[in-house]
C-alpha cells in the first residue's frame, strides 16, 4: 500500500508484484523436498519469523495468502497481481502504473520495518534498523516456480469464485 497514490486509487495501476524470497528451499524443485524435515523448513535464509510463517514461507503458501489478502484489501482482480521470487528479500512489492513507471517498497529483511509501518500508519516511526547499502546492492528476480503453479492457481481461484474459498484455502493450509 505504500507504493500506491495517497488517494489509494488503483485506476492507474497496471500490475502489482508481490515478492517472495523462495524460503529455505529456494532453487529446489518439488521432487527434492521429499526428505526435508520441519527444522529444514524453519531455517529461513533471510528472515527471523515465528514457526507458522516460516513454514508458510518454505511452502510459498504465505505469498498465496498475501495474494488473496491483497485482492480484498485493494479491491482488485487477481489478474493484476504477479508473484515473483526475489532471493535477497530487499524489494517487498512493486507497483507498475499504466504509463510504464514502477515504484517499489524496499528495506533490508527486518520484520520490525513492516510491523512498525502497519502499527503507525500513516506515520513513520524512527526505529533502529540497518539501511540498505546501495553501493553494494544486487537485486535478482525469478519467475515463481512452475512446480508450485497449482497452489497459486488455487489461491487465484479462491478469489475469483467465492469469498468463502479463501477461508477454505487458509484452513487447508
Where are these regions (language model features)?
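Catalytic, metal-anchored helix/loop core of enzyme active sites in primary metabolism
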Residues: 1-173
